[in-house]
Design a protein with these regions (language model features):
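Catalytic-core "active-site belt" of small-molecule-metabolizing enzymes
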Residues: 32-233, 247, 270, 274, ...
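Short strand-turn-strand beta-turns centered on an Asx-Gly dipeptide
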Residues: 217-218, 260, 280
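A conserved acidic, glycine/proline-rich C-terminal tail/linker
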Residues: 238-266
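Short, charged beta-turn/beta-strand-edge "cap" motif at the junction between a beta-strand
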Residues: 263-267, 281-284
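Carbohydrate-binding surfaces in secreted/extracellular proteins
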Residues: 277
Length: 293
């Protein structure tokens, strides 16, 4: 599926973006930074409302023509609205770290988003699908930091900053209609992050590069893969997270979660499922689905 297929292309799309830019930039003396900040706040609120109200929205980037850097500004502004309601930051997630995910989503760049405590669901419990619009699930690896990460790390340093690793599943739920978006839209939408289920953490960080990954629905294998699909070694996701956070002027406190990215393509969720992931030598995680998406 090419998720950018409906975002518009060619002269018509370029003209629309140019007209939008002109309308914003030539406000008869209006301060551009004020206009830009207002637009970012407006788009952040649109995405926040879509998530809160479980109401999909049309893609935003084709209309407003924002850049990737501006998409991250929208993302942070949207997460700030969550924080203002009392949600607490708990870590970060990386996206498009596997070739399968890039192909499925029709993009070619690694992206990252922010996690809050409201996104965490109890392992083994029922996850109400009415919390989402059109949820999908993907098997992942999650790291727990033992020390503050305040600078870019090398692969050789990473283990010294980690308390453990766990099998995990991420529930993704694009706020865009029919799960169709371009790169800027998905970044603004916090990389589609909606929920996280974690298994037990283990301190054993050895040999993470090629462990078998199986995700099952009601006991039937629906996705098979390897941790090697995550940048060749999931520990490289920690390196990338440290670089991205530092570039954004952020630190990751001790006790932060780092969702390393998907090992396989995502699968759509439906009511009445027992969903599980097992990772060789690491353990498993599971949940059930209740309600209706």
């Amino acid at each position: 599926m090419n998720v950018a297929e409906d975002h518009g292309s060619g002269a018509g799309s370029a003209m629309k973006r140019a007209q939008t830019g002109a309308a914003l930039g030539a406000q008869h003396g209006a301060d551009w930074e004020t206009v830009r900040a207002g637009l970012i706040a407006q788009l952040a609120a649109t995405l926040d409302d879509a998530a809160r109200l479980r109401r999909e929205t049309d893609p935003l980037a084709p209309v407003h023509g924002f850049t990737l850097d501006q998409a991250y500004e929208i993302q942070r502004a949207s997460i700030a609205l969550r924080h203002a309601r009392g949600e607490k930051p708990v870590g970060v997630k990386l996206g498009f770290t596997s070739r399968a995910k890039m192909v499925q989503m029709g993009v070619d760049s690694l992206i990252w988003g922010l996690l809050t405590d409201a996104m965490l669901y109890e392992e083994g419990a029922a996850v109400p699908l009415e919390h989402f619009i059109h949820p999908r699930v993907e098997p992942e690896v999650c790291f727990l930091t033992s020390r503050e990460i305040d600078r870019p790390l090398t692969l050789a340093e990473v283990a010294g900053y980690l308390a453990g690793v766990a099998p995990a599943m991420e529930i993704i739920d694009s706020r865009f209609r029919n799960f169709k978006f371009n790169l800027e839209d998905v970044v603004a939408d916090n990389c589609s992050s909606a929920g996280v289920v974690l298994g037990e953490f283990t301190a054993d960080l050895r040999n993470l590069a090629n462990r078998g990954v199986t995700m099952r629905f009601n006991g039937r294998a629906v996705a098979l893969g390897s941790t090697g699909a995550i940048l060749g070694n999931p520990l490289r996701s920690v390196v990338q997270a440290s670089r991205l956070a530092s570039a954004a002027g952020l630190t990751l406190p001790a006790g932060s979660l780092i969702m390393a990215g998907a090992a396989t393509a995502a699968e759509a969720l439906a009511p009445g499922l027992h969903v599980s992931v097992s990772i060789g030598g690491m353990g498993h995680a599971e949940f059930t689905t209740g309600g209706q998406a």
